[in-house]
Amino acid sequence: MQLHKIIFRYIICLTFGAAIITGLKLITSSIALWTKRSGQVMSGIYNFSDYAKYPLSIYNKATPIKYMLLFIIPFGLIMTLPTQYIIFGFCDIFPNVYILIVTICAMSLLFNFIGVKLFNLGLYCYESSGN
């Protein structure tokens, strides 16, 4: 495969991966509108990203952690799989790279939509924590 196509697809994955991270931050930060504190939730979610530093193939197919890293808190989807694609030229979970790209794009739209809706709902419940 031509190198410029691989790099272009990788840049698309990185761009929409950044959008997923933005949506995830918006979701976890919006919790503070109700609770006044969201630091523990945010750090818990981002500590979960340590599991995505390793290839997803080390996790058994039956483990829920693999699917959580792909679809619930998709750090594996945006960290491991695009890198695996650029290094090896294929991805073991998604047989076609276009399915991977469409999944990343759809997840970024979903997470940002949920984040914006949660933020707007939180604005109705917001009370200042000032003195």
Question: Could you describe each region identified by the protein language model?
Answer:
Residues L3-K5, A18, Y51, P82, ...:
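Aromatic-enriched hydrophobic runs in primary sequence
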Residues M1-L3, S30-S38, G89-D92, F119-Y124, ...:
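Transmembrane helix-loop junctions in multipass membrane proteins, especially transporters and channels
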Residues F8, F16, F48, F71, ...:
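Phenylalanine-focused residue identity feature
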Residues I21, K25-Y85:
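Transmembrane helix segments
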Residues Y51-I58, D92, L109, S129:
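Short amphipathic alpha-helical patches
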Residues M1-S30, W34-T35, F94-C105, L110-N112:
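Alpha-helical transmembrane segments and their short interhelical loops
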Residues C105-N131:
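Junction motif at the cytosolic side of a transmembrane helix
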Residues T80-V102:
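Extracellular/periplasmic helix-loop-helix junctions in multi-pass membrane proteins
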